[in-house]
Amino acid sequence: MKGLFIRTYGCQMNVYDSERIRDVLRPLGYAPVETPESADLVVVNTCHIREKATEKVYSELGQLKRMKEASGGRMTIAVAGCVAQAEGEELIRRQPAVDLVLGPQAYHKLPEMIARASRAIGDRLETEFDTVEKFDALPKTREADGPAAFVSVQEGCDKFCTFCVVPYTRGAEMSRRVDDIVFETRSLASQGVREITLLGQNVNAFHGPAPVLEGGEDWTLGQLCRHLSKIGGIERIRYTTSHPRDMDDDLIAAHGDTPAMMPFLHLPVQSGSDRILKAMNRGHTADHYRDIITRVRAARPDIAIASDFIVGFPGESDADFEATMQLVRDIGYAIAYSFKYSSRPGTPAAEMHGHLSESVKDARLQALQALLREQQTEFNASQIGKTLPVLVTGKGRNAGQMHGRSPYLQAVHFEGPDDLNGKIVDVKVIGASLNSLTGELVRVAEAAL
């Protein structure tokens, strides 16, 4: 067997891609190893969404270069993902120790690229946008890694937000065939997977070809979620990341009529200022976003809302930032992710006037995060005394402790036997912190027996 080490940066889609890279390489005799030093092939699966993430990649490659030299050149280094797509030849120029560079739509070609590299012939670079070919070429079954799994259903983005590199690194929106998604999900369920998270850059833009036996028009995400909920063993369904422009009535209704859909919605808004939303090319207003949340909560009153925010976008005034703070107060988030604006080469926002100083961006980020932490702490504390169904995902740090996730995606720690792993159990919440809950085991839910 040959050793394979994969370092994954960035989003859940990259985590999924890394899992599929392992699937692609398994027939070639590659098996995962714990450290890069013991690997014959190291794959760095990269993120290009912010400058800091890109620089982490180059730092990692410097360390791998030294390991490769120490191994006498035995190690093969491959760079995959969005940095590979965006920088291509520049990446090879900056770090000649890299053997292979492949974009996120080309990892099904990795076996061929490895073969070419071993013979020192052919191109070291693959960055074509052939998403359909990629999904057709991937192994139809996957090896599950625990009771929860990601399933990619959509890739690419047609929205062209002015701050974002995704349309340039992931390509146009493309949805997988429903039959292929169902086959993959059934395979995972047969291995004990209880929860799936449907992935896409704009997952609620999903319009996948309908099942062959049913025909008709392309299916929406709401239709897909209802269908997947009928697969035996699949008891929980989530999806991420969604866009307000694609939050249609049927998907909102599915949150109310499909019990397997978890009461958790991650719907990024980025700003509460209409002026900044327009400059970002988001295609919606703050009030439109508020209306979506109102309708989702009407369909599923117990739903928890999550979001993403960018502070310090070019031209953002004090009034614009206050509009964001007011939106946060109005909505009340269970959790949210916030970042300083990071200029990305090649995006329209990078060429805009009015870039803010780091000190202003820092101050605004601190203020926003303080408010978001307060809301997250309050939401977690509101669970104390409640009994929640928890999907057990493994052992905790302490002896006799297990951990899992609540319907609201909170980490939950409780004492219990090891054989609960993979089951859904009832846990009474007795404590809460910013990032997790603690509880007492009540019973194993009937569906898990």
UniProtKB/Swiss-Prot annotation:
Pfam families: Radical_SAM, TRAM, UPF0004. Binds 2 [4Fe-4S] clusters. One cluster is coordinated with 3 cysteines and an exchangeable S-adenosyl-L-methionine. [4Fe-4S] cluster 1 binds at C11, C47, C82. The keyword Cell inner membrane does not apply. It catalyses: N(6)-dimethylallyladenosine(37) in tRNA + (sulfur carrier)-SH + AH2 + 2 S-adenosyl-L-methionine = 2-methylsulfanyl-N(6)-dimethylallyladenosine(37) in tRNA + (sulfur carrier)-H + 5'-deoxyadenosine + L-methionine + A + S-adenosyl-L-homocysteine + 2 H(+). Residues 2-119 form the MTTase N-terminal domain. Keywords: 4Fe-4S, Cytoplasm, Iron, Iron-sulfur, Metal-binding, S-adenosyl-L-methionine, Transferase, tRNA processing. One of its GO terms (cellular component) is cytosol. Gene3D superfamilies: Methylthiotransferase, N-terminal domain, tm_1862 like domain. The keyword 4Fe-4S applies. GO terms for molecular function: 4 iron, 4 sulfur cluster binding; metal ion binding; N6-isopentenyladenosine methylthiotransferase activity. Disulfide bonds: none annotated. Its EC number is 2.8.4.3. Residues 143-378 form the Radical SAM core domain. Its main location: cytoplasm. Its cofactor is [4Fe-4S] cluster. It is found in: Cytoplasm. [4Fe-4S] cluster 2 binds at C157, C161, C164. InterPro entries: Elp3/MiaA/NifB-like_rSAM, Methylthiotransferase, Methylthiotransferase_CS, Methylthiotransferase_N, Methylthiotransferase_N_sf, MiaB_methiolase, rSAM, rSAM_horseshoe. Catalyzes the methylthiolation of N6-(dimethylallyl)adenosine (i(6)A), leading to the formation of 2-methylthio-N6-(dimethylallyl)adenosine (ms(2)i(6)A) at position 37 in tRNAs that read codons beginning with uridine. Belongs to the methylthiotransferase family. MiaB subfamily. HAMAP family: tRNA_metthiotr_MiaB. Monomer. PANTHER family: CDK5 REGULATORY SUBUNIT-ASSOCIATED PROTEIN 1 (PTHR43020), MITOCHONDRIAL TRNA METHYLTHIOTRANSFERASE CDK5RAP1 (PTHR43020:SF2). NCBIfam families: miaB-methiolase, MiaB/RimO family radical SAM methylthiotransferase. This is tRNA-2-methylthio-N(6)-dimethylallyladenosine synthase. It comes from Hyphomonas neptunium (strain ATCC 15444). The lineage of its organism: Bacteria, Pseudomonadati, Pseudomonadota, Alphaproteobacteria, Hyphomonadales.
